[in-house]
Amino acid sequence: MADIQDSGCGRYDNPGYYTGIIDMCAPIPLHRQSGVPGKVPGALLVARGIKNCIPLLHAPVGCAFQRKVNPFRPWDIFFDTPCSGITEVETVYGGNDRLFNAIKAVAGKYRPDLVLVISTCAPDLIGDDFESVIREVRKEIPCEVIYTTGNARRQPVGVQDALTSVIDQLVDEPAEKLEHGVNICTLPAHNATFKIAELKALLEEIGAQINGIYFIDSTVDQIRKLSRAKLNITDTRQEWCRLAENKFGMKSLALNQFQFKSLDDSPGTVSGTVKLLQHIARELDLGEPAYAAIERKKRQVENELARWKEKLQGKRIAMTFFLHGGAGSIMVKELGMECGVLIIKTPALSRSLKRESVEEMIRRVVDFIQRHQRSEPVVLFDPAPEDEIAAIKQNNIDLAVCGLNAVNLSAYLGRGIRVFDEGRFTRHHVRVGFEFVLNLAKEVARVFDRPVSRKTLLSLLDYSSGKERPHLTEYWANIAECFQSVWFCDVCECAGEGGK
């Protein structure tokens, strides 16, 4: 048997386990590069989303080291990550035999339904013949095997690379298409366990046929039938959808395209959800019964929302700028709350976006607020923590909506400011459908029902006095600044200063 390395631990797939541990791990600051969906961590995410799938890293042991922690979900762990362990010998003579034996060993030890072979730089450079190895090993093992490399001119991101391989090597040609078939496609990295139930129910209510939900604990048999649907609904634009369209004639719809067009069309709002469902009804040719069902659901939600709006309307909030609006903008539009202070932190945006793009996004948010309330908000650009708190006090703010870039929640509470933890709400309640705004209304009302707690354990820490990371202690803020400076260093500018 090949010498494969693994932790020997089982996997946990209980969504209820995550709630507390997510809150504990989510604030951990990560070096930006660890969050890039590179070849290995991205492919591991895909493996995590397929039931009884074991990823096999065809790599030197060094490449497989420290891949137990998922950088996108630090509360999650890849327990089973066997590695073929190629050495200098294979880099000279080729690693085909090593890969063949490793696949057999994994199939014998884990009894998986699918082995996902993940290649790395070394076998890619020496040109290991994955296709012929897998063709031969399939004759000797009872499970399916697919492989992913970066050689096929695919988008060089692990998630897209692996999903493209799944579509190319695992999905069957459909014997027949479902007339109104649709796939809901997402990943465990997007907390999908918490957000797809309502979307599925809404689609069925308007007459769509749910072919499958991918890729969250999907079985191999379910994945084989993916091509029976006419439409793939995805979180974001996905490279693999192009292959599915060319190979199986499937259309695709990226949910985030509604957010980019207009804050009013965000799927988190009532009108945005209605427009999304109407768009899907047109794509699937569901006819008038679908539009009637959408209108009935809209009236039902608006009636339920009216009770909460009566309680919250007119409350003044302070909110931080969010790229696609966030909870604060929905409070303004759907709950009738008034934004008195808008806090905009530009450094994080300016690092990765052009100045013109940043200014356009800010303009959109300000225009959105002005359309939905009578008064203009006080706009603060990169305020110091003390200035931020002072503005909230001076403008009679009832609730501070705190995102990641806000002053630490404990700092607000310590000054007697009532807070809404937008980060925690988003982690647990983000979803596509009407429940998002209803849950938001309930959570905001619950905050007003509780007294403001001035003294918390976290308020005893000394937080950074800088403008960029007031939510971190001075120690962690300095480390984060070091990583950010290294990551965003502009080579051209450095070269221009003396050519070094």
Predicted feature residues:
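An N-terminal assembly and electron-transfer interface module characteristic of large anaerobic redox
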Residues: 1-500
